[in-house]
């Protein structure tokens, strides 16, 4: 039988999450505080005894690890620093130290979870990450990203390859 878990099972519907977020500040303050992120990951397991637990993090830790500035606008969601020169997108390099807190969270959750509880890591798809990196925010139609992809397939392909490489490393880091 596959484990039962819910997308976004940790989060704002839980009063204990809201209290911890108020204490810590913003969303990214929770994500990059391994103690707090582990606590948020474990909250729904304690409350509902789900079969599976999903890592509390965000897909945008990947572009952050690639050097883009990341922040959240209240009421509007995530933002990434604009990439003015798309020719340099594929030159972004991974800084694994920007993922250390996430890996610490994984270790803390693994140590605290009951043996019978499945633990799921995750990462965003390269296309989804690319849309945020190019647009600097979420986009309903991804028009800016599609324009870039069609206008310069080679450069866009390099961007996708760079995102794919760090995503593979990131997922392997979650497993290790």
Predicted regions and their residues:
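Gly/Ser/Thr-rich helix-start
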Residues: 12, 68, 125
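Active-site-proximal, glycine-rich beta->alpha crossover segments in alpha/beta enzymes
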Residues: 71-173
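Pocket-flanking alpha-helical
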Residues: 64-67, 109
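Non-catalytic positions within long, well-ordered alpha-helices that form the structural scaffold/packing
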Residues: 46, 175-176
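N-terminal basic, low-complexity leaders that serve as flexible interaction/assembly modules and, when applicable
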Residues: 1-65
